[in-house]
């Protein structure tokens, strides 16, 4: 059985980990970083950039750079790139493909299975969309687990011998969750969860952006929010300012040539203090307090019952957030986990539980929202209350609302409101073939079945006729099986195109290095080679220059080989004349490591990486 990776698919950054030798290890990406920006950029030449390289060029390509797509998971939102519509699942799959490739590079083997985390307060549509994203990326998602629960696994794996209750406060880039867990004897039991899927670090950035834009407009009469490139620069500057204010009392925001008018170019040079930042983001911090209060109430606990407070997510580095949690709970938050990595680490531990690598750990998670159906008068009748341990199954008998009714339409809803229309409709299905009878006589048993991923199945049975209908919830905003399959094929096609593009870049890079090194050697060789020998090599170099920028990678490789072969006699002479017996044994070494396959692929790869980092 191959390795199962654990993925924290975040709003702003993602992270991947794997179990090695019984311990979770965070995998660095191809750029050497332990987290990868969840950013996708589409280039004019059809190339797709993902991660840090995509984030770096967002200012110059704002229309074709997609950020924070996680906030739209499970909705009908589409991204339009050059007339092609992309769903949030497809964009997320591009991020997952990058993560998968980095994991495969690290492990040296193909990765096909993963555990992926989601915010605890994600509804069924959002969870299903996340699973679809994994499938499109070529991953079988064995388990969807809640982010705070994953963080608790990372925190508590080495503390399974002591019983204690923890409150996990998870404020990420785009979502907020709070979960209360009971840890003891290797059992991680979620007692309650609450949250806000529209609260995160992005909102803090937006507050700073608005403040800067308002100040600039007041001084210059220009609305920067109408200029896409200026907005992207403001976004980057706001995120940077937020991060700096976590360590400093003030920061300088300097954006030269942000725009221009008839009087000339305009610049931003603004000092933002931590006190001002706290003032403009106070309402966001306050929004996180009520979910903590509700989670405690649902768990039937008081603050005195909580033993530890765990902070998760990059946004918990904001001093005002830490202070608010401390003031509310009366406890100093634990520093026992890395807020950026612990969710991925927890996902890897869960993967280890599934493979049997991690023993004596049991995870009991809950459904975050109440599930029910719409009944007469538009009332939402609950079947499974929020914070019920999953997997679970629950049945309830209903009847018809009219005489001689032969079918019923069942509207499945998720949420805490009294009326069905105020909750999220997960899907509808019809039970037909009910025997005609006065209203209230037929007995229709509705059964809800929630699996360990939090994915819902609903069935209805007419107990009189034995007729049955069922639905696996796939809301209209999710992709159909055909759409997922199509997206999988497109993702595979892009992966193949990316591979070819990389081969071409490597071949061109190899050619340039070969040309440079051998031309340099020819200029230094003096009378150790005849003019005819030099001319023969230069002719092959000219042939290489003609083909290297074309699309035929094999022709480029052949031309490189021809240059190397033509240089071989000169290299041999050089070493013989120098009396270098060892050198004569490897005349190709005179080319300074510029050779291509089949001589020395490793050297070429190293050159390629250095150029890429520049």
From Swiss-Prot:
Chain intervals with Low complexity compositional bias: 583-597
A Pfam family it matches: HSP70
Expression triggers: By stress conditions e.g. heat shock.
Annotated keywords: ATP-binding, Chaperone, Nucleotide-binding, Phosphoprotein, Stress response
Residues annotated with Phosphothreonine modification: 175
Family: Belongs to the heat shock protein 70 family.
The protein's name in its UniProt record: Chaperone protein DnaK
Organism: Clostridium beijerinckii (strain ATCC 51743 / NCIMB 8052)
Lineage: Bacteria, Bacillati, Bacillota, Clostridia, Eubacteriales
Gene that specifies this protein: dnaK
């Amino acid at each position: 059985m191959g390795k199962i990776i654990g993925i924290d698919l975040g709003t702003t950054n993602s992270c991947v980990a794997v179990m090695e030798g019984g311990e979770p290890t965070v995998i660095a990406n191809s750029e050497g970083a332990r987290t990868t920006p969840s950013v996708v950029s589409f280039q004019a030449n059809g190339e797709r950039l993902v991660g840090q390289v995509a984030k770096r060029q967002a200012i110059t390509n704002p229309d074709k750079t997609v950020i924070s797509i996680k906030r739209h998971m499970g909705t009908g939102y589409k991204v339009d790139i050059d007339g092609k519509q992309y769903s949030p699942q497809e964009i997320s799959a591009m991020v997952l493909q990058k993560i998968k490739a980095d994991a495969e590079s690290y492990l040296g083997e193909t990765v096909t299975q993963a555990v992926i985390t989601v915010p605890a307060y994600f509804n069924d549509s959002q969870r299903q969309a996340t699973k679809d994203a994994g499938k499109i990326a070529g991953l079988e998602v064995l388990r969807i687990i809640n982010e705070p629960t994953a963080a608790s696994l990372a925190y508590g794996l080495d503390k399974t011998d002591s019983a204690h209750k923890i409150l996990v406060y998870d404020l990420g880039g785009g979502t907020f969750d709070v979960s209360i867990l009971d840890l003891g004897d290797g059992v991680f039991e979620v007692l309650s969860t609450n949250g806000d899927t529209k609260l995160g670090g992005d909102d803090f950035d937006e507050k700073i952006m608005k403040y800067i834009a308002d100040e600039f407009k007041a001084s210059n009469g220009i609305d920067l929010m109408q200029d896409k490139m200026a907005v992207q620069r403001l976004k980057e500057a706001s995120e940077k300012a937020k991060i700096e204010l976590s360590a400093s009392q003030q920061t300088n925001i300097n954006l030269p040539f942000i725009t221009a008018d008839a009087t000339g170019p305009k610049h931003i040079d603004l000092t933002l203090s931590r006190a001002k930042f706290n003032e403009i983001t106070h309402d966001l911090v306050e929004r996180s307090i009520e979910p903590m209060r509700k989670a405690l109430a649902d768990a039937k606990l008081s603050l005195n019952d909580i033993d530890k407070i765990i902070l998760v997510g990059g946004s918990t580095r904001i001093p005002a957030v830490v202070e608010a949690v401390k003031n509310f709970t009366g406890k100093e938050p634990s520093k026992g986990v890395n807020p950026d990595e612990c969710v991925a680490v927890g996902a890897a531990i869960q993967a280890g539980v599934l493979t049997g690598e991690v023993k004596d750990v049991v995870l009991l998670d809950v459904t975050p929202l109440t599930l029910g159906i719409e009944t007469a008068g538009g009332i939402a009748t609950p079947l499974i209350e929020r914070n019920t341990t999953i997997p679970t199954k629950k049945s309830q008998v209903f009847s018809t609302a009219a005489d001689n009714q032969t079918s019923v339409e069942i509207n499945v809803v998720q949420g805490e409101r009294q009326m069905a229309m105020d909750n999220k409709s997960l899907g509808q299905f019809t039970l037909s073939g009910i025997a005609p009878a006065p209203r209230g006589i037929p007995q229709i048993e509705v059964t809800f079945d929630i699996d360990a991923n939090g994915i819902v199945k609903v069935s209805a049975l007419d107990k009189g006729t034995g007729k049955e209908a069922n639905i696996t919830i796939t809301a209209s905003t999710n992709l159909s099986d055909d759409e997922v399959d199509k997206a999988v094929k497109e993702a595979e096609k892009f992966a193949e195109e990316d591979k070819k593009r990389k081969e071409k870049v490597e071949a061109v890079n190899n050619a340039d290095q070969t040309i440079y090194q051998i031309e340099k050697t020819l200029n230094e060789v003096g009378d150790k080679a005849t003019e005819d020998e030099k001319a023969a090599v230069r002719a092959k170099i000219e042939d290489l220059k003609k083909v290297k920028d074309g699309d035929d990678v094999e022709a480029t490789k052949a031309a490189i080989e021809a240059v190397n072969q033509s240089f071989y006699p000169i290299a041999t002479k050089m070493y013989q004349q120098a009396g270098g017996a060892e050198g004569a044994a490897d005349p190709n070494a005179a080319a300074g490591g510029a050779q291509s396959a089949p001589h020395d692929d490793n050297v070429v790869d190293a050159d390629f990486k250095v150029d890429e980092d520049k």
